[in-house]
Amino acid sequence: MKKKPATIKEIARKLKISPSTVSRALNDHPSIGLVTTMRVKKMAEELNYEPNQTAIFFKQRRTFTIGVILPSLSEPFFSSAISEIENVAGEHNYTVLMGQSHDDAKRELQIIHTFKKHRVDGILISLGKNTEDLSFVDLLKEAEIPIVFFDCVPKMEAVNKVYSDLSSGMREAIQSFASIGHKNIALINGPENLLASQERAEA
């Protein structure tokens, strides 16, 4: 039978110190000496102690989770992006929750609501090509959940975005065609609701 994780009170009883001392030692509080901290952490490991995530949330107002929403992992760019996001998040002790919208606006919104219920500390989102309703931005602001759009970003202002400089790229492409004598240049663009499409057209 698997041994149940210990509590702070059990660790304190074993070491004959107060529960508050154990709690501070586990959180590396400067008021606790190095020897005591090491004793507490060693006993915590021996007793299979696991921090109460709910208690941590109420104390720090953080869940150490980040939500990522993207169209599809089958696209090489997004599979590389999620890998790097997880690497950086892991370095800062954050866990990444990931959802694929498959360019379905309703599914995208469902994932956003799920992340909100899980009280993620922030959301990274690459919009699906069919997303037009951005009312969720205000919803997340009210819930004090930061949101950053990346790659496929909306036209709206006053939101955090990370995306490529498509205007400069398009101008260089057009100049390249013009330099070899082409005058009638066609553009096959993406959905009008995305900033990327607007920048390509305006270039």
Predicted regions located by residue number:
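Amphipathic helical "hinge" segments at domain boundaries
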Residues: 38, 47-122, 191, 202
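Short glycine-/small-residue-rich Rossmann-like dinucleotide-binding loops
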Residues: 27, 70, 127-128
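Short beta-alpha junctions and helix-cap segments that line functional grooves
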Residues: 111, 126, 135-136
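Acidic/polar helix N-cap motif
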Residues: 10, 28, 104, 165-166
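Short beta->alpha connector loops
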Residues: 102-105, 128-132
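N-terminal helix-turn-helix DNA-binding module of bacterial transcription factors
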Residues: 1-64
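Bacterial carbohydrate/catabolite-sensing allosteric modules
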Residues: 1-3, 14, 46, 87-95, ...
